[in-house]
Design a protein with these regions (language model features):
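N-terminal ordered "arm"
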Residues: 1-54
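Short, hydrophobic/amphipathic alpha-helical patches that form generic packing surfaces
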Residues: 12-23, 94-98, 162-166, 217-224
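A generic structural motif
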Residues: 28-41, 173-181, 196-197
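Charged, alpha-helical interface segments at or near domain boundaries
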Residues: 33-130
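Acidic, Ser/Thr-rich peripheral helices and adjacent loops at domain boundaries
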Residues: 48-53, 57, 190-204
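Short coil/turn segments at secondary-structure boundaries
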Residues: 75-80, 178, 231-238
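Internal, well-folded beta-alpha domain core
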Residues: 105-195
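Long, compositionally biased intrinsically disordered terminal regions
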Residues: 172, 183-184, 188, 203-254
Length: 254
């Protein structure tokens, strides 16, 4: 068995699919597996092949999906590529095998387990993105830059950033993914872009949570005074706002 591995980036993922598919045409799809790095438990009898990103190959895969399946199918693949699930890359590969044979109607084939898995990943990533749109808390630095820290399981900060680009187009802000050390940066009246942070940049941005502006205290006061003591329900609250998502929410900080 050949196992193709790559970094958790869209270009690398698409390149990995390209190389694995080319090899599968020679030895068969059943002899190929795909996994995102890092690989925590390697097997002895399998051959591991690392794949680096190649923009030309990645673009060919993207173009083929949109042309031979549909743009909607590419959207599902894109969302699945953001998932933190261990089988996400293999699920994309399995879905494309079905998609290239069925065409545009593949997403209506609900009886196929590979199609259903890609739909599950799409919904999971979409839900997490929606939650963090609600849970993001921005803090002002000198009244010029707004910074929000998140720790999502899936790589959703660009999806979250798309929402705030529509709400705050004329502000300079950034959303930092503390797990992946990346940032979605929005220049004033500009387009969002993704930046991979250096160690120094990340440590500097981590300190931004130590600053409090005039609205931080006001929000904490509002949060604690608007509640009705007789109707407190911490079980329900944890269901709607899980503890692992609260780390950077100022209202839960002492």
């Amino acid at each position: 068995m050949k196992i193709y591995t790559c970094k958790d980036r869209l270009e690398d993922i698409m390149t990995c699919i390209y190389d694995a598919w080319a090899d599968a045409l020679l030895i068969g799809h059943d002899q190929i597996r795909l996994k995102k790095e890092p690989i925590f438990q390697a097997t002895l009898l399998d051959e591991y092949i690392h794949v680096d990103g190649d923009s030309f190959k990645a673009e060919k895969v993207t173009r083929s999906i949109r042309r031979d399946i549909s743009s909607r199918a590419y959207l599902y693949v894109y969302y699945a590529s953001l998932s933190a699930e261990e089988d996400a890359l293999q699920a994309i590969y399995n879905f494309l095998r079905v998609g290239f044979s069925m065409g545009a109607g593949v997403l209506e084939n609900y009886t196929n387990p590979h199609v259903m898995r890609i739909i599950e990943l799409y919904r999971s990533v979409g839900n997490e993105s929606h939650h963090f749109r609600e849970f993001a808390r921005f803090q002002s630095l000198d009244g010029r830059v707004y910074v929000s820290h998140l720790e999502p399981k899936s790589d959703v900060i660009m999806l979250v950033g798309r929402h705030f680009a529509d709400r705050m187009p004329s502000e300079y802000w950034m959303i930092v993914d503390d797990n992946r050390k990346t940032a979605c940066i929005h220049p004033k009246d500009g387009e969002n872009y993704l930046r991979y942070l250096t160690g120094g940049e990340f440590e500097a941005l981590r300190k931004t949570e130590e600053y409090e502006d005039e609205y931080t205290g006001m929000w904490k006061t509002f949060f604690h005074t608007i509640g009705i003591k007789e109707r407190e329900n911490y079980v329900c609250q944890r269901n709607l706002f899980p503890i692992w998502k609260r780390k950077h929410a100022v209202e839960f900080k002492e």
